[in-house]
Swiss-Prot record:
Its main location: cytoplasm. IGPS catalyzes the conversion of PRFAR and glutamine to IGP, AICAR and glutamate. The HisF subunit catalyzes the cyclization activity that produces IGP and AICAR from PRFAR using the ammonia provided by the HisH subunit. It is found in: Cytoplasm. It comes from the Bacteria. This is Imidazole glycerol phosphate synthase subunit HisF. Its EC number is 4.3.2.10. It comes from Acinetobacter baylyi (strain ATCC 33305 / BD413 / ADP1). One of its GO terms (cellular component) is cytoplasm. The lineage of its organism: Bacteria, Pseudomonadati, Pseudomonadota, Gammaproteobacteria, Moraxellales. Keywords: Amino-acid biosynthesis, Cytoplasm, Histidine biosynthesis, Lyase. One of its GO terms (molecular function) is lyase activity. Pathway: Amino-acid biosynthesis; L-histidine biosynthesis; L-histidine from 5-phospho-alpha-D-ribose 1-diphosphate: step 5/9. Belongs to the HisA/HisF family. One of its GO terms (biological process) is L-histidine biosynthetic process. The active site is at D11, D130.
Length: 252
């Protein structure tokens, strides 16, 4: 059985981490490279960097930040945000990203995922799914940071993205995100019942049990979290020990 993964997530705007980070020994809390280095030292299995800068000017900053990060971080690095064309993926991979996350662009042009997967290999294409609950066991895909409804059924979409060559699905519950009430377990379970590619649970972690539930009850292959780590509530080694104690295979 493959070890499950813990993935801290950095939201970066114009080269600065925006969901505050309170590592006491980091003088400049806003530098994503410092934050990533710290997570690397703590034993994160991967690091996800979401660029929420919309401006073209900001993209150059992003490539530079990814280059710096790749030089000081020795775990797989996933970069997402504003990825709209094959050239964006090429530039990010060249800068040192191991995987690239595609979100809104996949909704507007599903063939983009196919093209990216064929060109670069499924192993480096992650499709990010932002889903909102609309009824009993139904969820809808939203774009633009969860602001725009698409009318697309999230479960059907997950299957389609797997068929189109996504190597992994990053599933965020818009309902759970920021609540600290735990992942949307039903959503994860329904998606995992339908696809065979790895899934990452995202949105809603408030404690370590939530991470365990994402894996044991939701069937996730990896669990993503931000504030639980950023604010020093828990360290990655603590999280790994906690999960391992529940019988989950971890890289300790």
């Amino acid at each position: 059985m493959l070890a499950k993964r813990i993935i801290p997530c950095l939201d970066v705007d114009n080269g600065r981490v925006v969901k505050g980070v309170q590592f006491l020994d980091i003088r400049d809390a806003g530098d994503p490279v410092e934050v990533a280095r710290r997570y690397n030292e703590q034993g994160a299995d991967e690091i996800t960097f979401l660029d929420i800068t919309a401006t073209h000017h900001g993209r150059d900053t992003t490539y530079r930040t990814v280059e710096r990060m790749a030089e000081s971080v020795f775990v797989p690095l996933t970069v997402g945000g504003g990825v709209r064309k094959v050239e964006d993926i090429r530039l990010l991979l060249n800068a040192g990203a191991d995987k690239v996350s595609i979100n809104s662009a996949a909704v507007f042009n599903p063939e983009f995922v196919q093209e990216a997967s064929q060109r670069f290999g499924a192993q480096c294409i992650v499709v990010a799914i932002d889903a909102k609950k609309t009824g009993d066991n139904t969820w809808e895909i939203f774009t633009h940071g969860g602001r725009k409804p698409t009318g697309i059924d999230a479960l059907e979409w997950s299957v389609k993205m797997a068929e189109y060559g996504a190597g992994e699905l990053l599933v965020t519950s818009m309902d759970a995100d920021g609540t600290k009430a735990g992942y949307d377990i039903a959503l994860m379970r329904e998606i995992n019942n339908r696809v065979s590619i790895p899934t990452i649970a995202s949105g809603g972690v408030g404690n370590l049990q939530h991470m365990a539930d994402g894996i044991l009850k939701g069937g996730a292959d990896a669990v993503l979290a931000a504030s639980i780590f950023h604010f020093g509530q828990h360290t990655i080694p603590e999280a790994k020990q906690f999960l391992a104690a529940q019988g989950i295979e971890m890289r300790l």
